[in-house]
A protein has these predicted regions:
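NAD(P)+-binding Rossmann beta1-loop-alpha1 motif at the extreme N-terminus of oxidoreductases
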Residues: 1-40, 44
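Active-site-lining helix/loop region of Rossmann-like oxidoreductase modules
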Residues: 137, 148-219
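Rossmann-fold NAD(P)-dependent oxidoreductase module
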Residues: 14, 18, 120, 166
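General beta-strand structural signal in soluble alpha/beta enzymes
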Residues: 49, 125-129, 176-180
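Rossmann-like NAD(P)-binding element
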Residues: 44-87, 92-101
């Protein structure tokens, strides 16, 4: 599959690398065509890179791995025409570090980033997932022992099915994937971040995750 990963940070690079390893044709998008991180990644892993629009245009599926506070601007740069009809996997979190750590979490208007993007791009099929864990666990759930879960939120059932298949290819068993319902449920997933950040500070590692007891706990 042709997949665009928008964002050149650690999350974007981790997801793009995993997708290449699974045989996908991956393009990394950034604000400028000559982004050094994107060029380095493409040279090391065999993907391509360009602007947000360059990456999104030919893609069959788009991953938003930009920071949640700038995701709308990034997707606007990618272009509505380049997103129309496509599944957009939103893994972002709106984190404001202006007052230090832990950051403030969430958009000023109380919506989730996923809802903001869906409203801005109504012909795009937005699915929220993977934002409740560190990037290494996203693509290698076996790093965390025992039962733990990944969440899905979205208004389009077909789009969620596509994303569930992608998660399965990352190693997420079907009984570990919890569909929270429509896209309004993404608010709950994004608001897990304050708790995640506190636990990260206490544990000193990101190798942990949330699990719902009673859902596949014996798997």
């Amino acid at each position: 599959m042709k997949i665009a990963v928008l964002g050149t940070g650690e999350v974007g690079r981790r997801l793009a690398t995993k997708l290449v390893s699974l045989g996908h044709d991956v393009a990394m998008g950034s604000r400028t065509a000559d982004n050094a991180e994107a060029a380095k990644w493409a040279g090391e892993y065999g993907g391509t890179h360009g602007t947000f629009a360059d990456a999104a245009g030919p893609a069959e599926l788009v991953v938003n791995a930009t920071g949640g506070l700038v995701s709308l601007a990034a997707l606007e740069a990618a272009g509505a025409a380049n997103l129309r009809g496509k599944v957009l996997v939103d893994v972002s979190n709106a984190l404001d570090f202006s007052e230090g750590f832990p950051p403030k979490v969430g958009l000023p208007d109380g919506r989730s980033v996923a809802e903001q993007l869906q409203q801005a791009f109504p012909e795009t099929r937005v699915v929220k997932t993977l934002n409740t864990m560190t990037n290494t666990v996203m693509v290698e759930p076996g790093r965390v022992p025992g039962h733990h879960n990944v969440f899905l939120s979205g208004d389009d059932e077909g789009a969620k099915a596509v994303v569930a298949e992608l998660l399965a290819s990352f190693g997420w068993a079907a009984d570990r994937i919890i569909d929270l319902g429509d896209l309004s449920s993404a608010r709950a997933a994004e608001q897990l971040l304050p708790l995640w950040l506190r636990l990260y500070g206490m544990l000193g590692t990101g190798d942990f995750n949330f699990g719902v007891a009673g859902m596949g706990a014996g798997a």
